[in-house]
Amino acid sequence: MHKISLQFFFVDNYFFFWKQSKYQSIYAIQIRCFFLTVNRTPIPKQTFSLIVFYILIMIIQHLKEIHYLISASAKLLLASNYLLELLISHNIQFSPIRSFFIIMV
């Protein structure tokens, strides 16, 4: 599954483009900035600072999503290990393939 989300910002007549792609839980961040002005004047410092601020906010949001993903997978792994220990403590016999499946799930 390949998901691409696009977000566009218009800041003081400067066009900002952000592309975030997700491919099988592998996150890739690509940042592209296009500055379009009518009179080709240089970018004011305040506008540039605002654009950098937007980039930092997006990266922080992206890292929070990764943190939630890691946290959920860690909880799932702990639950599967607890289930495996519970089965072993009750002397339930199963094949190595099934035990591997329980650990992986």
UniProtKB/Swiss-Prot annotation:
Alphabetic keyword roster: Meiosis
GO biological process: meiotic cell cycle
Domain of life: Eukaryota
Function: Has a role in meiosis.
Protein name as annotated: Meiotically up-regulated gene 52 protein
Phylogenetic placement of the source organism: Eukaryota, Fungi, Dikarya, Ascomycota, Taphrinomycotina
